[in-house]
């Protein structure tokens, strides 16, 4: 009886569609679902597999979100954060990137690349001085 239960559980697990939602587009574009379409494909067992349509290859959704936002100061183009100065913009992926402020009032985001904190900024500074 136990082996039958395990077989049924394994079969149900294999037939169940799994979809990973990382929330990036919901977070980035407000999650309105505009233009998001699902396609259903039937299988021999009567099941349905959901496939989301790829994001459009143009930046129309991004531009629409950008236009809807209000910011009295500076609206960061990559994170859509409202800050006082461009070099205050946060990195889009702070868990994986280190923000480095440049002398010209700009900032760049550099991948940690497995280095300890501050090491990426040190390497950028060495490169700017021509030492790397």
Swiss-Prot record:
Protein name, as recorded: Long chronological lifespan protein 2
Top-rank lineage group of the source organism: Eukaryota
Family assignment from sequence similarity: Belongs to the LCL2 family.
Xref: InterPro entries: LCL2
Keyword Signal: yes
Function, in words: Probable component of the endoplasmic reticulum-associated degradation (ERAD) pathway.
Alphabetic keyword roster: Signal
Record keyword Signal present: yes
Cysteine disulfide partners in this protein: none
Natural source organism: Podospora anserina (strain S / ATCC MYA-4624 / DSM 980 / FGSC 10383)
Region (Disordered): 33-59
The encoding gene: LCL2
Stored PANTHER family: LONG CHRONOLOGICAL LIFESPAN PROTEIN 2
GO biological process: ERAD pathway
Stretch forming the signal peptide: 1-20
């Amino acid at each position: 009886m136990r082996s039958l239960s395990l077989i049924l559980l394994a079969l149900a697990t294999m037939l169940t569609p799994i979809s990973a939602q990382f929330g990036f587009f919901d977070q980035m574009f407000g999650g309105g679902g505009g233009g998001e379409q699902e396609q259903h494909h039937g299988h021999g067992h009567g099941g349905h597999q959901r496939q989301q349509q790829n994001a459009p290859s143009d930046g129309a959704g991004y531009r629409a979100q950008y236009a809807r936002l209000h910011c009295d100061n500076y609206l960061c183009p990559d994170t859509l954060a409202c800050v006082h100065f461009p070099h205050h913009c946060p990195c889009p992926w702070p868990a994986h990137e280190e923000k480095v402020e440049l002398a010209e009032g700009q900032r760049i985001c550099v991948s940690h690349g497995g280095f300890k904190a501050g090491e990426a900024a040190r390497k950028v500074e060495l490169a700017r001085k021509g030492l790397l």
